[in-house]
Amino acid sequence: MKKIECACNFLMDKDAQGYIDLSDLDLTSCHFKGDVISKVSFLSSNLQHVTFECKEIGDCNFTTAIVDNVIFRCRRLHNVIFIKASGECVDFSKNILDTVDFSQSQLGHSNFRECQIRNSNFDNCYLYASHFTRAEFLSAKEISFIKSNLTAVMFDYVRMSTGNFKDCITEQLELTIDYSDIFWNEDLDGYINNIIKMIDTLPDNAMILKSVLAVKLVMQLKILNIVNKNFIENMKKIFSHCPYIKDPIIRSYIHSDEDNKFDDFMRQHRFSEVNFDTQQMIDFINRFNTNKWLIDKNNNFFIQLIDQALRSTDDMIKANVWHLYKEWIRSDDVSPIFIETEDNLRTFNTNELTRNDNIFILFSSVDDGPVMVVSSQRLHDMLNPTKDTNWNSTYIYKSRHEMLPVNLTQETLFSSKSHGKYALFPIFTASWRAHRIMNKGV
């Protein structure tokens, strides 16, 4: 209590500029309580565990102050300076921070939850593991975090349309934006363009975060059916140099004409022979990756794409199409539905067939090529490089009446050299539920 009384006595002393001078003092655990705290200098003071309980703090200076565990139970901080202030676990939660300069401060593990932040500066700050959950950055002026350490900082569902994150440290940074300001926004173009610019200011080592933010923005615009040439052109310009421009969700929004071309091309060639060029392979693989339901509607098209892409000389195309194929094959968890009836004969285990089982009919892409009936579990095993699976004497059908045994390995299945023009690869699978097989046969 003595320290509190002592601190209050200092409030009576003002300097020539009308400021109350509380500089270079040990004010540990003081409790400042009142209506308005105005024109007070806490320059280089020790404010550890201090509580400010008032309606407003205005025109105050906390430069180089020690502020560990300081609590600001205020409605508003206006025109306040925290330059080079240092301390952890400072609580600004639910305050209005209006024209507050935090530049060069060290405020790790601090709490900015649900703050309304206007015209404030966070340049060169150390904000390790601080929380801005549901904070609102409301100023028309850009909120700046240039060169700040934002490691493990949580910007969770923040309302934010302007910001500069240039040269920040962003390891483990989490940033999600509340897009509620899209609704009834009189300057929607400006709002969207500012967000696009803000995303672009994030450093290149935060590419995954930039990608997520860009995709979520585009998804929000697509859900609301907001299409505007102005900010679409801005996206093309700003995002064009970044890898996430290739994300199918973004491309389908800013290059919607490409989707139409894809759909038209696929419809036209659904039942005909197609020779894909390199760019078509890339585009169509991306399209199927994001819209796997298209596969069942475009089986012939998909067969040929898989075939030609796996034979491509482009390693990236081969890797992407192999990933697409494996993901698609593994999309259903299915039990084995074959039993051994003789040494080299497998047949359907009808006792094991359920409505949830899939039987895959596997085709070669060449004319009159072999066809195989197999359970998806066999394919799962085949595609598992860590599992030593014996594929001897699986029955391959060149027709319903002619059976040819073959040793089915990854080499015989996917290497065009092993069977010449009758190579078994690619597996193209059309899956039928087991009850269809039982009803219709194979």
Curated annotation (Swiss-Prot):
InterPro entries: 5peptide_repeat (IPR001646), Pentapeptide-BTB/POZ_domain (IPR051082), SopA-like_central (IPR025726). It comes from the Bacteria. Transmembrane segments: none annotated. It comes from Escherichia coli (strain K12). This is Putative protein YjbI. The sdgG mutation, which suppresses a conditional mutation in dnaG (DNA primase), has been localized to one of the ubiA, ubiC or yjbI genes.
